[in-house]
Design a protein with these regions (language model features):
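Carboxylate- and glycine-rich phosphate/diphosphate-binding segment that chelates Mg2+/Mn2+
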Residues: 1-52
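Short amphipathic alpha-helical segments and their helix-coil junctions
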Residues: 12-21, 58-69
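Short glycine/serine- and small hydrophobic-enriched flexible loop segments
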Residues: 15, 40, 63-67, 85-93
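Flexible, glycine/charged-enriched surface loops at secondary-structure junctions
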Residues: 22-31, 48-52, 69-78, 95-103
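Alpha/beta-hydrolase fold catalytic core
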Residues: 34, 52, 57, 63-66, ...
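Short, flexible active-site loops
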Residues: 41-44, 65-73, 124-131, 146
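Conserved phosphate/anionic-ligand binding catalytic regions in large, soluble enzymes, centered on
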Residues: 48-61, 76-86
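Mobile late-domain/C-terminal helix-loop "cap" segments
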Residues: 86-171
Length: 171
């Protein structure tokens, strides 16, 4: 049910983006409906994972302004858009690789977190990751389901399709 609702939200938003790219006319009603359905998926799961992923992590990185990113700027949606394009490129690159080997989860060290995020952000990041869900994930699942993962990635727009859509939307 939640996956279907998330897909429905995505389909509505993609259709609105295609319309905007073709006509320059924004379908605010459709975009609002897509956002509401996306929000509902989060409510149903009591978590934002249904509507956000790695692309949002990139946006949050810009918003947090860690060392070396102090001058980064952009509104959340812009950053998510850039993150989405970067993720599409990386996902397609990964899908072109042979089946990976399972590698056990290794949490980031406190020293690494402090080095990358600085004293201002490190305590919150360390606390947020105390019970990292990845520690409960069996990496063999990726190996066992690699063909299915590739198939899902191949349902994403190609890098060229995404680039054309972004250009059509003046993004």
């Amino acid at each position: 049910m939640v996956a279907d609702l998330a897909q429905e939200a995505l389909d509505i938003m993609r259709k609105a983006a295609d319309k905007y790219a073709a006509t320059g006319v924004a379908d605010h009603e459709a975009m609002t409906m897509a956002q509401m359905k996306s929000g509902l998926t989060m409510q149903l799961l009591n978590h934002s994972r249904a509507a956000s992923g790695a692309e949002h992590l990139m946006a949050h990185l810009v918003e947090m302004q860690p060392p070396r990113f102090e001058n980064a700027e952009g509104i959340h949606g812009e950053c998510v858009g850039v993150g989405t394009f970067a993720c599409i490129k990386e996902y397609h690159r990964l899908a072109s690789l042979p089946t990976p080997k399972a590698k056990p989860f290794e949490p980031l060290s406190e020293a690494w977190i402090r080095e990358k995020f600085g004293d201002r952000l490190a305590p919150g990041i360390i606390k947020e990751n105390e019970n990292d869900v990845l520690a409960t994930f069996d990496p063999q699942n990726i190996v066992d389901h690699w063909d299915e993962i590739r198939a899902m990635i191949n349902e994403l727009p190609s890098v060229e399709e995404a680039e054309a859509l972004y250009k059509g939307c003046n993004a």
